[in-house]
């Protein structure tokens, strides 16, 4: 065997013949084939099955409608906010009753559900008549006001109750175009004017009811100040002091002094204390808030709340202030439930919760029974004695009832002096009322004044 190496030559460009080699199939070709078959099968099913096609169409249609509905709702809300305006009036607001009265008088309203309001009207001669007003009840109502349509919706809550009067809370909502929102002011001003006309020239008396002030009876005709005859200088002195107080609010504020003024009228019963306060309220065009400290279930907290939430332009009247706490202690065992303390009254008069710009009048027949704490300045700033009739008052009262009867007046005054007794102005008025147009008969009956309990 030769050791000479064998030299093998090959062509680098030659391609090997692999025809005899078996190559395994790849997966890609098979997967593509399966997908094509499934796609064809599903496509045929969707195109050939009418139920499937209809369901898909409905789904697409429903989705489109839902999107459209959502868009419409959002667009309508935006449009509502831009074009519509609402005004809500709650039943606890003063304007609520005013608005219902205005609605009752409005001629151009469309209402199918009505409620009735009953009003008592007291005439100057003392007679009382009844007037019924039909107002819109709960529900929707349309009115046309100054060319604009207004929707009025009155709602009554079934779950919320006003504990003060036991009635459900109510709201009235007025809806109109935004461009007409100025009509709300016009409506409220008209309603206010109608309400104020019922009290024009009259004095409104308020009394406490639960935690709030309520009108007591019908507004009373104003009593003229000249109709109350006190001793010389008393009436004028109080009136000057009140006017001075009312015009110096800034002076009080600049000096950090509470803007309050307290008056005490003391003297025997029937001397004209309460009558003067009524006449003063008429002179000032003020109302009167009467607070009975002996009221059942009155507490210190309620007292503070009432005195801090008085109606505007009102005089606070505390009558028989000396008897309030005595009565409570004397009748406590018999079921009297007032729990106002003396310190509670003092805090209500001058505490941090007391109202500013307050005129308070207190009356008493026994000033000696009052505690010194209540007599201090800041609680009582002006004290005046209102006593029985003096010769000055007897003369003035006689001439008021019998103008021009000067000679008989002198005889009457002298006859009263000769009785050597104290006579109240209430007794004199009773005598004069009994003899309205008969001054001579009044003179003859002077002796009846000896009996203070005489009924004319």
From Swiss-Prot:
This is Mitochondrial chaperone BCS1. It is found in: Mitochondrion inner membrane. GO terms for biological process: chaperone-mediated protein complex assembly; mitochondrial respiratory chain complex III assembly; protein insertion into mitochondrial inner membrane from matrix. It comes from the Eukaryota. Present with 1990 molecules/cell in log phase SD medium. Belongs to the AAA ATPase family. BCS1 subfamily. A motif (Mitochondrial-targeting signal) lies at residues 69-83. ATP binds at residues 267-274. Residues 1-44 are mitochondrial intermembrane. One of its GO terms (cellular component) is mitochondrial intermembrane space. It is a single-pass membrane protein. Residues 69-456 are mitochondrial matrix. It catalyses: ATP + H2O = ADP + phosphate + H(+). CDD domains: RecA-like_BCS1. PANTHER family: BCS1 AAA-TYPE ATPASE. Its main location: mitochondrion. Chaperone necessary for the incorporation of Rieske iron-sulfur protein RIP1 into the mitochondrial respiratory chain complex III. Gene3D superfamilies: P-loop containing nucleotide triphosphate hydrolases.
